[in-house]
Amino acid sequence: MPYEIKKVFASLPQVERGVSKILGGDPKGDHFLYTNGKCVILRNIDNPAIADIYTEHAHQVVVAKYAPSGFYIASGDISGKLRIWDTTQKEHLLKYEYQPFAGKIKDIAWTEDSKRIAVVGEGREKFGAVFLWDTGSSVGEITGHNKVINSVDIKQTRPYRLATGSDDNCAAFFEGPPFKFKFTIGDHSRFVNCVRFSPDGNRFATASADGQIFIYDGKTGEKVCALGESKAHDGGIYAISWSPDSTHLLSASGDKTSKIWDVNVNSVVSTFPMGSNVLDQQLGCLWQKDHLLSISLSGYINYLDKNNPSKPLRVIKGHSKSIQCLTVHRNGGKSYIYSGSHDGHINYWDSETGENDSFSGKGHTNQVSRMTVNESEQLVSCSMDDTVRYTNLTLRDYSGQGVVKLDVQPKCVAVGPGGYTVVVCIGQIVLLKDQKKCFSIDNPGYEPEVVAVHPGGDTVAVGGTDGNVRVYSILASTLKDEGKLLEAKGPVTDVAYSHDGAFLAVCDASKVVTVFSVADGYSENNVFYGHHAKIVCLAWSPDNEHFASGGMDMMVYVWTLSDPETKVKIQDAHRLHHVSSLAWLDEHTLVTTSHDASVKEWTITY
């Protein structure tokens, strides 16, 4: 096998303000799962760096839940499709697919024998359905609500009971199977966001945007108590999760705290303050074995510490929005990956362990378009917020100093020796020296798109939407057009010099990579065909003999310079999402990022 996946650094959950996010637990207690875009992400709870991504939904997935048997997962998307798929094999084969209603699926519940499934959401003609998992035959009706149903749960002991919570401020109670509506519960004054039965089936709890949690008898549906008497939280409550022994309840709220409740004596055991920023609102939670997890509005997953509520044991960071660019850098004997996303967030990853964090301080406020590392160990990034930032990679702290404000929006940045940085903006090429603007070409006569600086530092290649690459010289802090026009096969999407400076690779929107030989006056060396859609990124291997290209066809090719027929093809590198950026950690390790917000490492063998 010429390639194999080495590491997957998964995306964070996709979250929305004021909407609860469901974390699904694995009955064995080893994994947890959540959704982002069209992906379902399964992670090991003890070592979250171990992840698996399921990408077979055609639409955005909202919720995924393990069957109590642990052998299958049911996942539902915004179109109303429910897919039931195998968890035991890497291929995740589809077992059944149903369309219980047309509209967003918001929650899923299984009976303890893994034979029946309840699905709720915002359908057009009904808000819920309950059916047999293998035939799809109905085993009851979910009625009694006149607005979207947000949550459903089924008692895990016989006799079965089913409870729902809705935007009509009510919960509803059902007996079955076949499940029949018994009564509505009108104790809440705002949307009911979450209903959950305790594992032993004796009680169920409802949580609402009014900040209250009510406990009811699991068999009869009679009210037992309100947690915290009048109010459980100062803000809306988005999620609740029972402890495995059914005595305690974990709650997550918009008041930026999570709490553990002792349900038997109706008191708070611990309060976890998560911060003061709006991004610290808590939208989801999960209690699995000894692990207490919560999701913040930032998308971060917090491992809560019962012994020290003020500080989480660990926080899983990463990206929840599409990654636009990446670069790699060795620091203190370790290789780090830096990735920048659509929301301006830059994250750094230890390439071996997957340990990661974001820079401290206030950084870019809009999409990070391109990043590279200069000779003084600074990360140079350009963003749609019209700035170029220089960030010290030892301190990893955004400072107020290293920011250059530009007149127009930058699209690409490249660095060379001597403190030079070349920035391609909309209709402008800017030369910076030592973080100061020293020269610019306004109205170059074409639309520049991408830029690369020769390792020697004296030459700059700029690719344009007109399908040409122009070569400039850096002379005494100015850019001089050498009058050299290199023709690509279509609008240029990326340019890259090999590390020894001998070759320039150019990729274009016409699905072709052209390599020019620098020493022979930029004569055409070879042309590489294979992609089925626009190529968007290029990266040279440190051996200068191979280079990789990634495109909108979800494919990555690793090409051999001397022979275009000898290539490694990584099909579906990021399934259903196009590859956005590439970089090499060493001669045999390639890193790819994509709009699915994940980072992957591949081992390439020739």
Swiss-Prot record:
One of its GO terms (cellular component) is synapse. GO terms for biological process: actin cytoskeleton organization; actin filament fragmentation; apical junction assembly; cortical cytoskeleton organization; establishment of planar polarity of follicular epithelium; maintenance of epithelial cell apical/basal polarity; neutrophil mediated immunity; neutrophil migration. The modification Phosphotyrosine is found at residue 238. Transmembrane segments: none annotated. InterPro entries: G-protein_beta_WD-40_rep, N2O_reductase_N, WD40/YVTN_repeat-like_dom_sf, WD40_repeat_CS, WD40_rpt. WD repeats lie at residues 4-45, 48-87, 93-135, 138-176, 180-218, 224-263, 270-306, 311-351, 358-408, 432-474, 480-518, 523-561, 566-604. The modification N6-acetyllysine is found at residues 28, 81, 95, 115, 480. One of its GO terms (molecular function) is actin filament binding. Coiled coil: none annotated. It is found in: Cytoplasm, Cytoskeleton; Cell projection, Podosome. Keywords: Acetylation, Actin-binding, Cell junction, Cell projection, Cytoplasm, Cytoskeleton, Phosphoprotein, Repeat, WD repeat. Disruption phenotype: Embryonic lethal. Partial deficiencies disrupt megakaryocyte maturation, platelet shedding and provoke neutrophilic autoinflammatory disease. The keyword Chloroplast does not apply. Its main location: cytoplasm. Induces disassembly of actin filaments in conjunction with ADF/cofilin family proteins. Enhances cofilin-mediated actin severing. Involved in cytokinesis. Involved in chemotactic cell migration by restricting lamellipodial membrane protrusions. Involved in myocardium sarcomere organization. Required for cardiomyocyte growth at the postnatal and maintenance at the adult stage. Involved in neutrophil actin dynamics and migration. Involved in megakaryocyte maturation and platelet shedding. Belongs to the WD repeat AIP1 family. PANTHER family: WD REPEAT-CONTAINING PROTEIN 1 (PTHR19856:SF0), WD-REPEATCONTAINING PROTEIN WDR1 (PTHR19856). This is WD repeat-containing protein 1.
